[in-house]
Amino acid sequence: MFIINTLMLVAPILLAMAFLTLVERKILGYMQLRKGPNIVGPYGLLQPFADAIKLFTKEPLRPSTSSVSMFIIAPILALTLALTMWIPLPMPYPLINMNLGVLFMLAMSSLAVYSILWSGWASNSKYALIGALRAVAQTISYEVTLAIILLSILLMNGSFTLSTLITTQEKLWLIFPSWPLAMMWFISTLAETNRAPFDLTEGESELVSGFNVEYAAGPFAMFFMAEYINIIMMNAFTTVLFLGTCYNPYLPELYTINFTIKTLLLTMSFLWIRASYPRFRYDQLMHLLWKSFLPLTLALCMWHVSLPIMTSSIPPQT
């Protein structure tokens, strides 16, 4: 039964990821006053499947000087971790209802750094290695603010379980009392998923394509899939944390529909930002985090800790 449940979670995620690639190309096309993919199938709807067939039937070439095992393990690990992070998300029922669901997701996103680092190092290419080092520095840096913002939200939630956020936000979305945190969280998720304007890892003019420059066919597709699955997952996580949906036990479908619509709107904003903003310079990227976000999130976290102590003389319940 557990295998069936897992498949029922994985299959829609993969399908959503496939169509997100198409939607992105369409939206970018229309924003640049062109059509986007429109040949394969009606309105180009079968384009993702054509891409998948093409990529997975090609020969997976690898550089002769690369480290074979690590070169192959890296994309598999990236995709596995991207799918694993969906386990504790309540939609409205999680696959496994974990007591420490938030910590699990933080741990999984930290592990994803290894797949990037291994891919860059195993490629034995200077461009791939520079891209990987950039990606790792960026991901680790922005995880600091993500963790502090999560801690502030959990102080309001009173539990590490994601399902209790539904109860916490029955009357009021957490985005209203903590909108500065929500804004910083959204920008940090952009950086965490290596999306524009923070896609420093794949600066075409300098690094060709970033850490996956030596990859082709199936392994390349796996990195691509992991990236887009992470985008959807981060937006779903944002929905759970800040835009909690009212849950009716008699109509759980309403929760799922509401949750999906919010996640889709957030994902659209990711695509809109990509079409609108130029890429940051690397020092600007790091200054934004260490000199702006980190002091502000720490101050807000201390505020959320001190508020219950000041108002009702109780320590925050977690």
Curated annotation (Swiss-Prot):
Provide the transmembrane region boundaries.
Answer: 2-22, 70-90, 100-120, 146-166, 172-192, 223-243, 253-273, 294-314
GO CC list: mitochondrial inner membrane
Q: Where in the cell is it found?
A: Mitochondrion inner membrane
| Entries under InterPro entries matching the protein | NADH_UbQ_OxRdtase_su1/FPO, NADH_UbQ_OxRdtase_su1_CS
User: Could you say which EC number(s) this protein's record lists?
Assistant: 7.1.1.2
- Please report the record's description of how this protein sits within the membrane: Multi-pass membrane protein
A Pfam family the protein falls into: NADHdh
Alphabetical UniProt keywords:
Electron transport, Membrane, Mitochondrion, Mitochondrion inner membrane, NAD, Respiratory chain, Translocase, Transmembrane, Transmembrane helix, Transport, Ubiquinone
Q: Which GO terms describe its molecular function?
A: NADH dehydrogenase (ubiquinone) activity
Q: Which top-rank group of organisms is this from?
A: Eukaryota
Subunit and interaction comment: Core subunit of respiratory chain NADH dehydrogenase (Complex I) which is composed of 45 different subunits.
The protein's name is NADH-ubiquinone oxidoreductase chain 1
The gene designation is: MT-ND1
